[in-house]
Amino acid sequence: MAAREVEEAADMIRADRKEITRKQGAAAGRRIRAKIERTSHSPENDVTPSNPESNANAAHPPWMPVALAELGIRRHPPGSINPRIVEYNNQTNLVGYDDKISWCSSFVNWCMARADIRGTGSALARSWLEWGRPLERPVYGCIAVLTRDDPASWKGHVGFYLRHDEEQVYLFGGNQLEEVRELAYPLNEVIGYRWPVAG
């Protein structure tokens, strides 16, 4: 990836942080800034700021500030429930469920709903393989669907693509070590990248 593209990707993330600061205050902005500073940006493992929908807004997806603002939301220990994760589940067919179930797809659905984009409404990660349109190459903020265990099974994981290198893909998502955070996964577990259909 060219140095110019790396800088454009970093600019998108900084703009997301500014939007979060404006809407949710300085503390939220500082959380994101700290996360950005901990993330290394090198040409071979940064995001591709391409524009799948051929308009200026596609390179800066509106759901990413929503997702990044949730950094650190985590599953509560047994005996208590995180009400925010219950909110995520309420965007799916798991209405009313607590935070003790898999909630990666619930988080993605919740973020998309906050950006006024209809998600799958399903708590199954692989439901995103039928949503939107496929991408040949991942772009910042696209939805990445991963296999889990047996590639032929219904199990999976879903999150928002940040970047990749030769071996790993870095996603921002929910239920990643039981919280909303960035996490690396084996690149060979990716089974699809998706983007909303325009209109």
Protein language model annotation of sequence segments:
Residues M1-M64:
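Cell-wall glycan-active module
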Residues G25, W63, C104-F107, R137, ...:
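Generic hydrophobic secondary-structure packing signal
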Residues E37-A115:
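N-terminal capping segments
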Residues A59, A113, I117-R181:
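...with weaker cross-activation on analogous glycine-rich loops/strands in unrelated enzymes
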Residues M64, V169, V190-I191:
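A broad, low-specificity signal marking well-ordered, structured residues that form hydrophobic/aromatic
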Residues R181-L187:
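Short amphipathic beta-strand/extended segments with alternating polar/hydrophobic composition
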Residues N188-G199:
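Low-complexity, Gly/Ser/Thr/Pro-rich intrinsically disordered linker/tail segments
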